[in-house]
């Protein structure tokens, strides 16, 4: 507001002192500025920091402020000191009949009018909000209240209308009325005496103060307005209804009553309060009551229905209800009424405080309208009738008191003993009542009725009466309001008694509940029954065991709202079974009656033997529970029981979970309702006193409770082994005597703790001991039952899921491989309907036969501590089968089946590593021992090749296990030979990374309608052309399959010129092919490959003009593909003159072999003279044989970069560099950087650009032994490879710059190269040899002499040298960064730090002069 700071005081000063300082600052002349308030706040901080105490008027005088440091703060302190020192003294003597109040010196600055006042302005909404925020929790008329309003008045100079607006905004209606009364009285007292400038003839003070030139008269009105607040009568502060929230220990009824009182005090008269309280009674209730109302759909219901719904809810700290009397020789006195709420103000009759107007002594009451209806005396009202006051409870009568008073004073002890006793439960007080009457049902002669001393009349449900009973409508006023359509009056006599023999009382009329919900014994019967109402002492249920200390942590300590799940109906058979189960649990002490919140449904389940089992559905409670980790990871591995402990005994505990008690605060989460037949009687509610079965944390809590007793037994018999899981205990000992002694000790110890040992389930050796569904023998472990695989197609989904679940359980103890399991699991894919019928394929039925054979080997050996652990890893395309065994054992220890983690192709070596790691973890957890040796079914050559060529970082992990890994082939020794019944694909052949000397060679090729092959070994053995489908790719596959079928089963070298077939075969070489067959013809390829013991796969270019034998034989295969025209043959051979000379068609044998080339436009442009070798199109047949180079342009921001791209024509490996300028020097620098990445090529093929044809570039290539040739650009047979690479790189650059617009060009190009070389290329093309890790050139040592070579020294600067964040494609770049290449013979590297030792020469050609500054 204006120039004033916030009214919130800073640290080190009270609110009243701070407001005094602010008001004193308002007297400064000229008016205070924001800097004055800042200086004032800085002064308070300085005072509090230096004096180590808060600022007060006595300690912070003008002398406490250093002059010149805090501006005009000394003037503010002087003004405050002057005003408070000159305040008026104590008031004079008062009237003799009233004692003057004690005088206290004022702590508030008096009202002043000195100084220049601000001009009048209307209130802004933000100013009104700030004022209300400052005084929101302050009492009206308090010091902070007065001073806050005074500061607001000094700054805005409000008119009476503005002050009235402010009063309506900040005060309640009650306070507004009291303030207006006080203000009117103050104006009337001051108007005739002390008001200066007031003329009664000109209007009222309010009207005159509103004038613009009112001046001092408005200031006087403002002072009277403030004084009226100060003169308000003191009254207790009423909590506003907007801030009322139900407390944690407050019942819902008390909360609603308190809300109604606050609404009555804070809302003006005539405002309807029912809609407001209906909404606030839910919005401000606590979460527990809100959830009850939400669950019953009563959020928008009237208050009465809400009170009725939450009637049974009680806070957790709530004490039991007030009793009429407690057991003992003496009965307590009368119940004291609840204290009345004090009045908010003085009585409007006598204007005195301390009493309500209805209790005012000056209130005059008129005579009664008629005689008293009881004694017929016309002089008094009925409430003052002496006859009514003298009636006793024992006499009864129609005018019974509102509460049942104690009868100790009116009866002797002998008379009390003759009275009937009504024992009441603490939660729902009920008593058995015997009824008789003409309108009752014959079966309702005895019933259980609720005792309610607050109900005036007795209530019966309508279903207890006959249909045609005499009735009249009744309007009943209850907690939910007036009910007009629910209750009727039964106009007929009804006889009641507490005992069959009487005494009986007769009631002329009684209320009937048409909703059949209530059966209540009201005050009209209780006052005449001549009975004593008492609450008996609590009868505790029997103590359960010695473990009476409940667990301190069960996962519900955060106390969420208990669930309210309704009980679903049950048929008569299940209901009778449930009642019997509840009765037995109640007798055993596992449950007890419950009347608190919470409910979870219950139902019985019939066991296979015909008995019933109690099931409590605690899923909602489990969802609210925080899980407790179990001590054991799961069922123990019984094969870990050592063989040197032959004596075994098994114990079983009965009702083990029911020995752990539960605290009372958690019982609401385990409550349930026992329904009655037909709902004719009230449902009974119970709650568990012990851990129930079905609770998520019951197993973990039981294990923790049983941990210490079992630990003591294990410590006493250290030479034995104790294995336990839940309530099953297995004890293994070396001798018979020790087993007997341990069993007796453990059984006695458990019985002392309250556990019951089931002696009928105790088993011991020499017979097999059953434990956890398995049989423990002396040397082995078997399963008690195995699934029967009598499966026929079709089969239902439920049956197949059951069989797979049983197979999963026994798969650890039987040699079930992953392949047949995967076949059955694959039949479940895509099935959503639970009623679906599945048709099994013949292969799946064959897998079932394999599983049936595997289940016949139901045995596992027990662990022998003297022998090492061995493992076998069997890898298949469906998954892995892992075996743990020991040497000399009859059976393995365990089988494990692990499926593929995903559908992506994974190398066999990686799967082997994962299998070894899984087996190691199982061995450590079960046997606490590491595995000595791993056997596997992979060929050693295939595994070695993966280790040498893979870039996976997990290769290092496999190398650490390499001394322990051994290839066992496909038939390992041991009892699991049935695991491998057939050879797995691509695991039998031994693939060779290099050509096999003196081996048979197979060359194959294909066209659109024909495939061909030839076999060669020192000479041509066989050749043939076979028909193929309408596809060149399938034609190549057909030629390869025909050649494999014709080749004898011996080592074979395969040469193909198809990139597709080469990639496929190389994938098989590395053992990375795990995908399903995409083409059925590949199955023939698999079988053909398995016939050869060793295979090498090579790639040859079909359009190569090289003179080596491999290219010649490949050209011969091309001749085996007869084509219709020479042009088709010319297109197939790509202008290969040597292949054209072998045209096989005799009809055109007389043709000139150069005729197709003469007619070909491409050949004419490339080789117009017909013999120039420099223009011949070639592609390399090995890495770094032939490169292609090109320069393309890329625009980024305001620069246009020249991208120098170099591509190896054999593998497609690429390097590129970005240069600002396009000169011969930059082209040489780009070639040098490519050599660093890819190695030195033998040949370089470029277009006919000026940079490539310059003498400098040609001379550079000659010095480094690089053969340079040129071609016509944009020719599909020549430069298509480098042109496509240009497009890919520019596309990747655009992507990275679109993702990061400010990415530097060097980083973007590095990412594009990494993406192209590492992702776009096939993995089989990325071996270490093929990624051009050429041997590094000789490096000059720092201590040696600098070589003296050519006078031409070409310097280059690699990208990323000065950028640490750059991530390049290869480590070789980091190793070679920061160097120079010296053009000597041979060339050598010069480290960058040694370049200063000699003069670095550069090219001095004329074309390099403009770019001399950018070189190097």
Curated annotation (Swiss-Prot):
Domain of life the protein comes from: Viruses
Gene Ontology MF terms: aspartic-type endopeptidase activity; DNA binding; DNA-directed DNA polymerase activity; RNA stem-loop binding; RNA-directed DNA polymerase activity; RNA-DNA hybrid ribonuclease activity; structural constituent of virion; zinc ion binding
Keywords: Aspartyl protease, Capsid protein, DNA integration, DNA recombination, DNA-binding, Endonuclease, Host-virus interaction, Hydrolase, Lipoprotein, Magnesium, Metal-binding, Multifunctional enzyme, Myristate, Nuclease, Nucleotidyltransferase, Phosphoprotein, Protease, Repeat, RNA-directed DNA polymerase, Transferase, Viral budding, Viral budding via the host ESCRT complexes, Viral genome integration, Viral matrix protein, Viral nucleoprotein, Viral release from host cell, Virion, Virus entry into host cell, Zinc, Zinc-finger
Catalytic activity: Endonucleolytic cleavage to 5'-phosphomonoester; DNA(n) + a 2'-deoxyribonucleoside 5'-triphosphate = DNA(n+1) + diphosphate
Nuclease in keyword set: yes
Limits of the Reverse transcriptase domain: 586-776
One GO cellular component, as annotated: viral nucleocapsid
Family note: Belongs to the retroviral Pol polyprotein family.
GO biological process, alphabetically ordered: DNA integration; DNA recombination; establishment of integrated proviral latency; proteolysis; symbiont entry into host cell; viral budding via host ESCRT complex; viral genome integration into host DNA; viral translational frameshifting
Domain Integrase catalytic residue range list: 1179-1343
One Pfam family matching this protein: zf-CCHC
UniProt-listed InterPro entries: D_retro_matrix, DNA/RNA_pol_sf, Gag_p24_C, Integrase_C_retrovir, Integrase_cat-core, Peptidase_A2_cat, Peptidase_aspartic_dom_sf, Retropepsins
Active site as annotated: 452 (protease)
Site feature: Cleavage: 109-110, 323-324, 419-420, 544-545, 1120-1121
Zinc fingers (CCHC-type), renumbered ranges: 345-362, 370-387
Cofactor note: The RT polymerase active site binds 2 magnesium ions.
Protein's recorded name: Gag-Pro-Pol polyprotein
Residues with a covalently attached lipid (N-myristoyl glycine): 2
Gene, per the UniProt record: pol
Binding site for Mg(2+) 1: 652, 727-728
Residues that, per the record, bind Mg(2+) 3: 1190, 1247
Domain Peptidase A2: 447-525
Domain RNase H type-1: start-end pairs: 996-1126
């Amino acid at each position: 507001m204006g120039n004033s700071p916030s009214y919130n005081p800073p640290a080190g000063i009270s609110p009243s002192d701070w407001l005094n300082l602010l008001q004193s600052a308002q007297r400064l002349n000229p008016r205070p500025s924001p800097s004055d308030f800042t200086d004032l706040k800085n002064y308070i901080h300085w005072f509090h920091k230096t004096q180590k105490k808060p600022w007060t008027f006595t300690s912070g005088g003008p002398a406490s402020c250093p002059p010149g440091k805090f501006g005009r703060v000394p003037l503010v302190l002087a003004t405050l000191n002057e005003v408070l020192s000159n305040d008026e003294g104590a008031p004079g003597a008062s009237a003799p009949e009233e004692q003057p109040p004690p005088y206290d010196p004022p702590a508030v600055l008096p009202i002043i009018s000195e100084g220049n006042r601000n001009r009048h302005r209307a209130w802004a909404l933000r100013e009104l909000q700030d004022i209300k925020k400052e005084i929101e929790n302050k009492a009206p008329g308090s010091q902070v209240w007065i001073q806050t309003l005074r500061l607001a008045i000094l700054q805005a100079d409000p008119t009476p209308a503005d002050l009235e607006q402010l009063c309506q905004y900040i005060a309640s209606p009650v306070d507004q009325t009291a303030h207006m009364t006080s203000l009117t009285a103050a104006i009337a007292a001051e108007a005739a005496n002390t008001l200066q400038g007031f003329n009664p003839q000109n209007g009222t003070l309010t009207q005159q103060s509103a004038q613009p030139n009112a001046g001092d008269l408005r200031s006087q009105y403002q002072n009277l307005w403030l004084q009226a607040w100060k003169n308000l009568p003191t009254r207790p502060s009423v909590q506003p209804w907007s801030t009322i929230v139900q407390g944690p220990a407050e019942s819902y009824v008390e909360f609603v009553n308190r809300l109604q009182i606050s609404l009555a005090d804070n809302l003006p008269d005539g405002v309807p309060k029912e809609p407001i309280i209906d909404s606030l009674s839910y919005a401000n209730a606590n979460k527990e009551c809100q959830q009850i109302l939400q669950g019953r759909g009563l959020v928008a219901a009237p208050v009465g229905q809400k009170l009725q719904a939450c009637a049974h809810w009680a806070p957790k700290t709530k004490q039991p209800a007030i009793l009429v009397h407690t057991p003992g020789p003496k009965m307590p006195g009368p119940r004291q009424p609840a204290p009345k709420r004090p009045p908010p103000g003085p009585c409007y009759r006598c204007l005195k405080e301390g009493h309500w107007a209805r209790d005012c002594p000056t209130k005059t009451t008129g005579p009664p309208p008629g005689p008293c209806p009881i004694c017929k005396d016309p002089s008094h009202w009925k409430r003052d009738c002496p006859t009514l006051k003298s009636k006793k409870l024992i006499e009864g009568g129609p005018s019974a008191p509102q509460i049942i008073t104690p009868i100790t004073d009116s009866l002797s002890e002998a008379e009390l003993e003759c009275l009937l006793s009504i024992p009441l439960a603490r939660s729902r007080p009920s008593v058995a009542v015997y009824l008789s009457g003409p309108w009752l049902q014959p079966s309702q002669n005895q019933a259980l009725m609720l005792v309610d001393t607050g109900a005036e009349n007795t209530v019966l449900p309508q279903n207890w009466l006959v249909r045609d009973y005499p009735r009249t409508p009744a309007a009943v006023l209850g907690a939910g309001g007036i009910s007009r359509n629910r209750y009727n009056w039964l106009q007929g006599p009804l006889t009641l008694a507490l005992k069959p023999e009487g005494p009986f009382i007769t009631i002329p009329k009684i209320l009937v509940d048409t909703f059949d919900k209530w059966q209540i014994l009201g005050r009209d019967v209780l006052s005449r029954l001549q009975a004593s109402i008492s609450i008996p002492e609590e009868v505790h249920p029997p103590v359960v065991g010695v473990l009476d200390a409940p667990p301190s942590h069960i996962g519900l300590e955060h106390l969420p709202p208990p669930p309210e799940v309704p009980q679903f109906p049950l048929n008569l058979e299940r209901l009778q079974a449930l009642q019997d189960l509840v009765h037995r649990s109640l007798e055993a002490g596992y449950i007890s009656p419950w009347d608190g919140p919470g409910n979870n449904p219950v139902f019985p389940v019939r066991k296979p033997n015909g008995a019933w089992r109690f099931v409590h559905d605690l899923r909602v409670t489990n969802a609210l529970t925080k899980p407790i980790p179990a001590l054991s990871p799961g069922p123990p591995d019984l094969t870990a029981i050592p063989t040197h402990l032959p004596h075994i005994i098994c114990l079983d505990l009965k009702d083990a979970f029911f020995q752990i008690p539960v605290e009372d605060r958690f019982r609401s989460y385990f409550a349930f309702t026992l329904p009655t037949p037909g709902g004719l009687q009230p449902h009974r509610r119970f709650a568990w006193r012990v851990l129930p079965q079905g609770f998520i944390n019951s197993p973990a809590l039981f294990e923790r409770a049983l941990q210490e007793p079992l630990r003591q037994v294990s410590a006493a018999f250290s030479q034995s082994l104790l294995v336990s899981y839940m309530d099953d205990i297995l004890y293994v000992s070396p001798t018979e005597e020790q087993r007997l002694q341990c069993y007796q000790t453990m059984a006695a110890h458990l019985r002392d703790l309250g556990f019951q040992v089931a002696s009928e389930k105790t088993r011991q050796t020499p017979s097999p001991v059953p434990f956890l569904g398995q049989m423990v023998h002396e040397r082995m472990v078997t399963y008690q039952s195995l699934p029967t695989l009598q499966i026929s197609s079709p089969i239902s989904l439920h049956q197949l899921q059951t069989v797979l679940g049983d197979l999963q359980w026994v798969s650890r103890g039987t040699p079930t491989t992953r392949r047949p399991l995967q076949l059955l699991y694959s039949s479940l894919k895509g099935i959503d309907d639970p009623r679906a019928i599945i048709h099994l394929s013949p292969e799946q039925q064959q897998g079932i036969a394999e599983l049936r054979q595997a289940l016949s080997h139901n045995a596992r050996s027990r662990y022998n501590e003297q022998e090492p652990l061995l493992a076998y890893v069997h890898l298949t395309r469906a998954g892995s089968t892992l075996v743990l065994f020991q040497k000399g054992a009859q059976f393995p220890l365990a089988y494990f089946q692990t499926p593929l983690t995903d559908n992506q192709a994974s190398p066999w070596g990686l799967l082997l590593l994962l299998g070894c790691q899984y087996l190691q973890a199982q061995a450590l957890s079960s046997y606490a021992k590491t595995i000595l040796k791993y056997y596997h079914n992979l060929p050693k050559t295939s595994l070695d090749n993966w280790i040498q060529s893979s870039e996976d970082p997990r290769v290092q992990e496999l190398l650490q296990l390499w001394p322990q890994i051994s290839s066992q082939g496909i038939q390992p020794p041991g009892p699991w030979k049935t695991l491998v019944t057939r050879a797995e694909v691509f695991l039998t052949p031994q693939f060779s990374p290099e050509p096999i000397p003196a081996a048979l060679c197979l060359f194959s090729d294909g066209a659109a309608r024909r495939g061909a092959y030839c076999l060669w070994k020192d000479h041509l053995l066989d050749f043939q052309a076979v028909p193929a489908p309408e596809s060149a790719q399938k034609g190549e596959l057909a030629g390869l399959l025909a050649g494999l079928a014709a080749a004898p089963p011996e080592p074979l070298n395969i040469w193909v010129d198809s990139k597709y077939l080469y990639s496929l075969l190389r994938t098989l070489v590395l053992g990375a092919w795990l995908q399903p067959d995409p083409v059925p013809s590949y199955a023939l390829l698999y079988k053909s490959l398995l016939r050869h013991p060793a295979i090498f796969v090579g790639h040859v270019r079909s359009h190569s003009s090289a003179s080596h034998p491999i290219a010649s034989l490949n050209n011969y295969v091309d001749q085996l593909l007869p084509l219709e025209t020479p042009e088709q043959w010319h297109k197939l051979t790509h202008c290969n003159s040597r292949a054209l000379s072998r045209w096989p068609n005799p009809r055109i044998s007389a043709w000139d072999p150069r005729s197709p080339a003469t007619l070909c436009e491409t050949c004419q442009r490339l080789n117009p003279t017909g013999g120039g070798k420099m223009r011949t199109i070639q592609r390399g047949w090995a890495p770094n044989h032939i490169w292609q180079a090109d320069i393309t342009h890329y625009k980024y921001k305001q620069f246009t970069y020249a991208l120098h791209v170099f591509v190896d024509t054999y593998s497609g490996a690429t390097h590129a560099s970005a240069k600002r300028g396009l000169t011969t020097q930059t082209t040489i620098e780009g070639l040098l950087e490519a050599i660093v990445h890819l190695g030195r090529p033998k040949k370089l093929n470029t277009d006919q650009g000026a940079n490539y044809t310059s003498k400098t570039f040609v001379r550079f290539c000659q010095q480094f032994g690089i053969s340079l040739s040129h071609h016509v650009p944009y020719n599909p047979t020549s430069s298509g490879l480098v042109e496509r690479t240009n497009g890919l790189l520019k596309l990747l650059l655009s992507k990275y710059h679109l993702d990061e617009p400010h990415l530097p060009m060097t980083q973007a190009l590095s990412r594009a190269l990494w993406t192209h070389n590492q992702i776009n290329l096939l993995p089989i093309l990325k071996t270490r040899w093929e990624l051009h890790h050429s041997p590094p050139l000789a490096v000059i040592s720092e201590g040696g002499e600098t070589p003296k070579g050519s006078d031409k020294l070409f310097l280059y600067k690699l990208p990323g040298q000065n950028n640490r964040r750059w991530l390049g494609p290869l480590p070789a770049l980091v190793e070679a960064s920061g160097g120079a290449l010296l053009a000597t013979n041979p060339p050598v590297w010069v480290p960058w730090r040694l370049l200063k030792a000699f003069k670095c020469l550069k090219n001095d050609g004329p074309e390099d002069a403009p770019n001399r500054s950018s070189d190097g």
